[in-house]
Amino acid sequence: MTSLVAAFPMYQRAELRPAFDALWSGTRDLLRAEGIAAPDALTTVEDDLLSFWQRPDLLLSQTCGFPFRHFLKDRVALVGTPDFGLEDCPAGHYRSALVVRRDDWRKSLDDLNGATFACNDVHSQSGYSAPLVTAQRAGLRFGAMRISGAHINSARMVATGQADTAGIDAVSWRHMTTFDAWVSGLQVLGWTDPSPGLPFITADTSLAPTLGLCLAQAIRSMPTELRTRLTLKGLVQIDARDYLSVLDPAA
């Protein structure tokens, strides 16, 4: 059998690596039992995720809704979306926390007009698109935008005064409030509307149903401590049309 590649690049941090590795090993073994040549270990992807997601040998990975609807919708198949049981979000959905420093004078969304905005990536649904849509609906316009490269970097830019605000993925924010003491210096000023969460994808449309079943079973079979650490409730199916209907910010 020809080996394929797999990666879980989203939400990775040292504290969660054992849990992600356990999720993969369980998924891998179930896939191999189905005759699918799942790789021994996950591939570490440190840059150019968009190219990785378009590899023809991509067995399984996780992407963001923005690149899916703009670049990947005709190149990959959806496998399923993790449900993290986020407050005020439907299953498999998430939203963005608009954060400011705890000692900042800004106390409402209206106060963000002209604020310097830290963004992990302009192809991010939670870090770029959703915050801008939220601001535009409120009749606001952010000031200068600074690209940070990661949600945790955006939060640090706000904490250190390099930016006034940032949109942080709710799952990432949950992890930060769990593992990073310094975020106590930040507060949530508001939230964006929920949108479909970060989906698992594959290059092989024919394998998508089997991948979804195996991944869902692997989640259910994870050791409780590790699944709890990820705050992972299960896998849900969200139609591609729901991803494609999410609004982009006006130019």
What residue spans do the PLM features occupy?
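A ligand-binding cleft/hinge motif common to bilobed small-molecule-binding domains
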Residues: 59-73, 159, 164-184
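Bilobed "Venus flytrap"/periplasmic-binding protein-like clamshell domains
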Residues: 6-26, 30, 90-154, 225-247
